[in-house]
Amino acid sequence: MQTTLRTLFRGAGLACVGAVLALPGLWAADSDKNPDAFPTFDSYIKFSGYAPAIHGDKAAFAPRNGFSTSGSGGVEDFFYSKDGSNGVAIKMNGHALVGAEDYLFDLNLSKDGVGSVDVGYKRFRTFYDGVGGFFPLTGLFQTMGPEALHIDRGSFFFDAKFARPNMPVFTVSFHQDVRTGTKDSSEWGAIVNPAAVVTAGALVGTAAPANTPFIQPNVMTVSERHRTLEAGAQATVGKVKEDLKVTFEWVGNTDGRAYVRYPNGNALGVIADPTVAVVDDLETVTSKTFRVTDKIVAPIMENLSLEIGLNYSRVSAEDGGQWITPAYNTTAKAIFQTVTAGNIYTNARVDDYVGNVFLKFEPVSYFKMDLGFRDEYNVISDGGSFIVTSLASGQTVINAANTNTATDLTYSHLVDHVATPEVSLQYTGINKLSIYASFDKRINHGSQHWVNPYAAVTTTGTGVVTTALPSLSSAIFFQDANQDYVNAKVGANWNASSFFTFRAEVFRKEHQNKFIGSNDVVGAASYGAYYATGYNFTGVNLTLVVKPTPELSFTTRFQPQYGDMSVLGDVAITGGSGNEITSGKSRINMISESIDWAPTKELYLQGNLNMIYDYIQTSYPDVVVSTTSNIPVPFQNADNNSVTCSGLVGFVLTHNTDMQLQGMWQRANNYNPQISLGGIPYGASYEINNVNIGVKHKFNDHLVGEGKVGYFNSKSDTTGGFTNYRGPLFYFSIQYAL
């Protein structure tokens, strides 16, 4: 939706009128009087700006529509190219929009018979809404500090190519990507609903819900760096082509999350003493990657060719961080700064080997077959440690002498082997009909063993040190991990005539993960255990295009997808099988209709309707909110039903002026606040409608201007109306030929 609405104002211009002119045969009788007078400039600069006047929740408007609420202006697009007489060419393009913080500069220099250099920098901003949550039982709305959040993404790039005639082509590139800012997120953890009464950090009273919601909204602070250096060589010897690449990557990330343990404390009669802010899950990641890839394409005969690919990569990583969760200690009757996991340190290494071979066979012009096999082997090892603090048993005073510190150790090792055969077919021997099919099966067999975190060293506040070894029966695991995936599809495209086109495709996905406790080590924690999860999906894609006339077309799409999720767990089964349980069901039906009509030379109309019926049912659909008979038990699915309608009218006002009208309406009604009595309501209910009108005018052969105004309106029951917004947005642009 964000891309669509931004297109209305910036990227699309008045493209609908151009679509009118492109319809085949429409201008055949009067081509010398083509009313489209808008030229295509070889080099140009385009200045633009927009200004919203939004009432309501501006922080909700920005991420949904992709516009800065403070407006933006600058150079929307710039392009310059020039070819020299000695084979040298220069191209420059870019933009700089202040407010939206969207910038690009790209310089390309090339010379025939030598190569090219492309260097530049780009940066853009993505907006997020820091909504913490809405509690329908009390009507409370929580935001996480500043509600208007954003992430800035920047990238410097340098790409060079050396391509002399009859010589190998050499390439080198360097990219540095940066991601910084804050965004909304969520994690698994307990918060207390304001409907409950919290005194001195403890839940008291009988206010519903008695259970605690276990999804925490939080603010994620991001600071990430990613550098990539790559060198390559492409060579052709006879008919054999080879492409070799060597890549180095460096990653340095520091991310963190923060949330409020007791939201809306001391508000509207809700007593939270104290309201605890938690700085949770501070993570640092430093990694280095070395990768070498080689691809060879060798024709064996006229209708048979061989493709071989080899890849090796090694990743070395060090992770760190802190996980500090302040909590109320009922014995000491005070807040204790619990270090759930502090001074985290892990060292991991991954070695990955991949090889694939493909045979491409085309015995006749109307039949193609690809046979392939991919084999992958990887080894993953890591070990680490962290500290945990706790108040000594029975202590009522929080100080260093009463605090125990444990150093936990952990380790894991995984060996994985994946074999994937593939086949694809295409047949075009029937006039105007193309039939295709593909099948692949991913066979993954692995073995893993690990040591759950255990307190290797415990030090009391008085200096007493205790050491321990991991328990074989509770901390040490040996397990086989098998993951088998099957994907298949078959389809056909039938271009019966210019009046009728039909496309159909059926696909099937079957995925299953099995984890079997190894019997080689008697007494291990996973001895004899068996656990399996999986899912299967069957889907159909149907598309019908009907064109009664060159000026009128109907496109109908129907995409049903049905699937079941399953789980099986039985620690008493020794590597055998048990009764599989259907843990979830997914049913999706997507129906859409598009109509394009150009009744006259100067008029174009388009209408779209899209309906989605989507629900996921889990094995726990009933939400028990009360044991009394007067409160009904709600039934909860993860519904995602919605309806979207849009329409567009474009027409030519004069030889130099076009106009466009466009509107969109979307609605969903899946929210059931009654669920909050005993759980978390996942469904969303909202209504969005937007309209805009735009005019494009050519002042002369070098100058074109555009002006647009739109109105946005959004209502959300999911957030109790606290994120509603409405208001106009004004846009203008001037494009000048250089």
Regions found by a protein language model. Name each.
Residues 36-73, 90-92, 172, 266:
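Transmembrane beta-strand segments of Gram-negative outer membrane beta-barrel proteins
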Residues 39, 69-76, 99-103, 150-156, ...:
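Residues that define the transmembrane beta-barrel architecture of outer-membrane proteins
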Residues 44, 75-79, 104, 157-159, ...:
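Membrane-embedded beta-strand positions in outer-membrane beta-barrel channels/transporters
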Residues 49-53, 94-100, 111-113, 121-127, ...:
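Transmembrane beta-strands of outer-membrane beta-barrel pores
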Residues 56-62, 102-106, 120-122, 130-136, ...:
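Outer-membrane beta-barrel translocator domains and adjoining extracellular loop/strand segments
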Residues 62-69, 92-94, 143-151, 159, ...:
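Outer-membrane beta-barrel domain signature
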Residues 85-91, 113-117, 166-170, 180, ...:
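Repeated loop/turn-to-beta-strand initiation elements of outer-membrane beta-barrel proteins
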Residues 697, 726-738:
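Outer-membrane beta-barrel "beta-signal"
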